[in-house]
Each structure stands twice: as structure tokens, then as C-alpha cells.
């Protein structure tokens, strides 16, 4: 009979050193790695995502990297299914599992769970598509039906408005009542140790600036040109930091040096949001610098 595997999560802002630390931890713990990164999940988005190279991945099986094409949709439900598949694989391989990345919302959903959504009929899909033609009007209408639920949703958030419309059109029940009837179930039900990298803000800004420079030297602009030509600007991933600024540069909006500055500034802002989210959403987290966490992780191996 397969024994329960050991799992841990490693979180921290972008450019904080998660990738290298996760690989060291996986080597010490005899573990697979599951990436929770909203860009590394895509094939062909290599430079701008700063995903681990093939060389870095040698010897450690990585999941959640190069998983889908840039024009394919990916959401938290898909990620949970991915985690479940990876967990089964890790158990079968008699490996532990290190979960690592900057998109900590996915980790939160693994721990808290999401409610199962109803199967959406073609009729409902058509009604929802029609309603989404006027996002503001749909938001206002849903707010009259379910003010408590909709006050947490921006009028410019098409994904969550679409979900609310689907639920109401399909079930005739407002989202609040639906989620009461179908509460979320955590996917990870056992205790999950979470290790959070803490980095000085100025040091992190320097790391981000250096990484941006390396991306440009490694061919960032050529990569974005290829992605635009192959997939257009329509996919959601084409709005990611590093991609949207490069597209603006290609449009002649600013010069190359300004491109580096724009990416650096926007990435630093993202890092601040990630840090704020991590501090507010997870309890009993083991915090420390990369070297401090490395010592803790390797001693506990």
C-alpha cells in the first residue's frame, strides 16, 4: 500500500529565489515539484516567465510548467485538477511533493477548496454571452439579485460576472444561496507546511532590475514578437507583465531603456501585491530569508 507523501509549499514574491530553493528542497526530500506560476504554465513563454531552464529541471520532475498553449484557457479549477493528477503521480512514484510559485491564490484554493459549479447548458452559455455584451449592466442587474455577493466583484471583472450569470441562468439561484448549498471542500485536507521567503524591498528591486536586464539580453523582444505573430494579442497571457510593456515598445510608445524601467517598476509592484497577499492569507507560515529557509528545509529532510 502506498504511504502518505510529504508535501510542503514554498511561496514568496517574484525574483525572491523560489526556483533555486525549491530545487534544493526537492533534491533533499526526494520530491517532485509542482509550479504555481501563472506564466510558467504556458508553453513557449520561456524568457518572460523566468521559468526554470531544462538544465535546472534535470533530475527533478517538474509539473505545471509548459502545460498548455498560450491560447488555451487556464483557471483555478483546471489547476486543482492538475494538482490532483500530480499528487497521484507523486504517490505512484513514491516521491514527496514541493509546491512552489508566486501565484499563491492557487495554493489558497487548494487549502480552502472551491464550490463545484453546475454543468452549464448551451442555452445558458448563449444567454451569458449575450448578457456579457454590456458588462456594467450585467453587474448592476446581478447586484439587485445578490448585493452581498456582487459587492465583492468589480464591474470590470468579466470572469467572475460570467460565473455569477452562469449560476443564476442555469439554476435560478443567486450565487450566495448556491454556494451555501454547495460549500467548498478543501483539496489538501492534511496540514501543509508553508515556507515564505522574506526579502528586503531594496534588494528585491535590484534583483528584479537585474532579471529584467537578463531577459532583454536573452531575447525577450524576439520572444514577444513570436508570441504575437503566432497567437495575436487576444489571449489573457498576452496582458502579463513583461509582455504588455514589450508590445507597447514594439508599438513605438517608448524607447528600449524605458522598456526595461517599465517592466522593472511593474514587476516590483506585483512583488508588493504578492507579499501583501501572502501576509494576509496564510497562517502559521515559516518565514525567513532564502538562506534561513534552506537551512530549515535541508535539516528537516
Curated annotation (Swiss-Prot):
Enzyme class: transferase
The protein's name in its UniProt record: tRNA dimethylallyltransferase
Protein's UniProt keywords contain Magnesium: yes
Gene name of the record: miaA
GO process annotations (BP): tRNA modification
Family: Belongs to the IPP transferase family.
Signal peptide: none
Record keywords: ATP-binding, Magnesium, Nucleotide-binding, Transferase, tRNA processing
Stored Gene3D superfamilies: 1.10.20.140, P-loop containing nucleotide triphosphate hydrolases
InterPro entries (alphabetical): Dimethylallyltransferase, IPT, P-loop_NTPase
One Pfam family recorded for the sequence: IPPT
Sites where the protein binds substrate: 14-19
Amino acid at each position: 500500500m502506498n504511504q502518505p507523501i510529504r508535501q510542503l509549499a514554498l511561496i514568496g514574491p517574484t525574483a525572491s529565489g523560489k526556483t533555486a530553493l525549491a530545487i534544493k528542497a526537492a533534491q533533499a526530500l526526494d520530491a517532485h515539484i509542482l509550479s504555481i506560476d501563472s506564466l510558467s504554465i504556458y508553453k513557449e513563454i520561456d524568457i518572460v516567465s523566468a521559468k526554470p531552464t531544462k538544465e535546472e529541471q534535470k533530475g527533478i520532475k517538474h509539473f505545471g510548467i509548459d502545460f498548455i498553449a498560450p491560447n488555451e484557457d487556464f483557471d483555478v479549477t483546471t489547476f486543482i485538477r492538475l494538482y490532483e493528477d500530480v499528487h497521484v503521480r507523486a504517490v505512484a512514484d513514491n516521491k514527496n511533493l514541493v509546491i512552489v510559485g508566486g501565484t499563491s491564490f492557487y495554493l489558497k484554493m487548494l487549502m480552502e477548496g472551491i464550490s463545484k459549479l453546475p454543468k452549464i447548458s448551451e442555452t445558458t452559455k448563449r444567454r451569458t454571452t449575450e448578457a456579457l455584451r454590456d458588462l456594467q449592466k450585467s453587474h448592476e442587474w446581478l447586484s439587485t439579485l445578490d448585493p452581498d455577493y456582487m459587492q465583492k466583484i468589480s464591474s470590470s471583472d468579466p470572469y467572475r460576472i460570467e460565473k455569477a450569470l452562469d449560476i443564476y441562468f442555469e439554476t435560478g439561484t443567486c450565487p450566495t444561496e448556491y454556494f451555501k448549498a454547495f460549500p467548498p471542500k478543501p483539496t489538501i485536507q492534511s496540514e501543509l507546511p508553508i515556507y515564505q521567503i522574506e526579502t528586503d524591498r531594496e534588494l528585491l528591486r535590484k534583483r528584479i532590475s537585474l532579471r529584467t536586464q537578463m531577459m532583454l539580453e536573452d531575447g525577450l523582444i524576439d520572444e514577444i514578437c513570436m508570441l504575437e505573430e503566432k497567437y495575436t494579442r487576444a489571449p489573457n497571457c498576452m496582458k502579463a507583465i513583461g509582455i504588455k510593456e514589450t508590445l507597447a515598445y514594439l508599438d513605438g510608445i517608448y524607447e528600449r531603456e524605458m522598456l526595461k524601467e517599465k517592466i522593472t517598476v511593474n514587476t516590483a509592484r506585483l512583488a508588493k501585491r504578492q507579499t501583501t497577499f501572502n501576509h494576509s492569507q496564510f497562517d502559521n507560515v515559516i518565514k525567513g530569508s532564502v538562506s534561513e529557509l534552506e537551512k530549515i528545509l535541508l535539516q528537516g529532510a
